[in-house]
């Protein structure tokens, strides 16, 4: 495919893309940049970044920034919905995933451990929304929309991996979400990526907490 993902040696904002690519059997190159090199302006990466941040996606001479934009581009593998309504609903689902992710980021980057109980209460509310969504779609294949996995599923799966690492029992009251994580994690190509050395050696975030 000739895809290159430029990012720090973390899972972070690039991991949902890696889950998607790995599961779809698409090869890519991880171009890892150390944070101190990024800050020092190596290869003019920061200077040339449209909004001063990465991940950066490149295919030939085409360069793209912003994680959700890149994720939607990669959804061209038939992962955005089968009609206009499904496409719109998947966008809505992905926005909901981002709401969940931002609450997680707020806690992991800015809150202290004393606020963990409050965060877990808020997390349970957010998880409840997705449990209800899966309940409504339970007659299909245990994905968020319709009967086929979408980019929103990869983004949700990555976010769930993050919160499970923080609180391993956080899905105990959500049987469909627990099953969702287990089912998707057993998809052969995705499982292969999840067991890869690249995935294992990368911490979730760069702040030393995960």
Curated annotation (Swiss-Prot):
Keywords of the record: Transferase
Domain GST C-terminal stretches: 83-204
Similarity field: Belongs to the GST superfamily. Pi family.
UniProt keyword Transferase, yes or no: yes
Biological processes per GO annotation: glutathione metabolic process
EC number: 2.5.1.18
InterPro entries hit by this protein: Glutathione-S-Trfase_C-like (IPR010987), Glutathione-S-Trfase_C_sf (IPR036282), Glutathione_S-Trfase_N (IPR004045), GST_C (IPR004046), GST_pi (IPR003082), GST_superfamily (IPR050213), Thioredoxin-like_sf (IPR036249)
Biological role: Conjugation of reduced glutathione to a wide number of exogenous and endogenous hydrophobic electrophiles.
Domain GST N-terminal: 1-82
Protein name, UniProt field: Glutathione S-transferase P 2
Catalytic activity of the protein: RX + glutathione = an S-substituted glutathione + a halide anion + H(+)
Molecular-function GO terms, alphabetical: glutathione transferase activity
Residues engaged in binding glutathione: 7, 13, 38, 46, 53-54, 66-67
Domain of life: Eukaryota
PANTHER family per UniProt: GLUTATHIONE S-TRANSFERASE (PTHR11571:SF141)
Tissue expression remark: Liver, kidney, muscle, skin, lung and ovary.
Coiled-coil region list: none
GO cellular component, one term: cytosol
Keyword Transferase: yes
Subunit composition and interactions: Homodimer.
């Amino acid at each position: 495919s000739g895809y290159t993902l430029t990012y720090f040696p973390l899972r972070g904002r690039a991991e949902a893309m890696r889950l998607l690519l790995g599961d779809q059997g698409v090869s890519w190159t991880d171009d890892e940049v150390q944070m101190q090199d990024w800050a020092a302006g190596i290869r003019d990466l920061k200077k040339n970044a449209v909004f001063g941040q990465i991940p950066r996606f490149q295919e030939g001479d085409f360069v793209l920034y912003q994680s959700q934009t890149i994720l939607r581009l990669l959804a061209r593998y038939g992962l955005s919905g089968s009609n206009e309504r499904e496409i719109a609903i998947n966008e809505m689902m992905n926005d909901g995933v981002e709401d969940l992710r931002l609450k997680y980021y707020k806690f992991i980057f800015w809150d202290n451990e004393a606020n963990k109980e409050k965060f877990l209460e808020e997390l349970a509310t957010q998880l409840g929304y997705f449990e209800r969504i899966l309940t409504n779609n339970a007659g299909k294949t245990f994905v968020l929309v319709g009967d086929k996995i979408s980019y929103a599923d990869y983004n949700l799966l990555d976010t769930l991996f993050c919160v499970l690492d923080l609180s391993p029992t956080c899905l105990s009251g959500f049987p469909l979400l627990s099953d969702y994580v287990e089912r998707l994690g057993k998809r052969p190509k995705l499982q292969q990526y999840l067991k890869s050395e690249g995935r294992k050696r990368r911490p979730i975030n760069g702040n030393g907490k995960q």
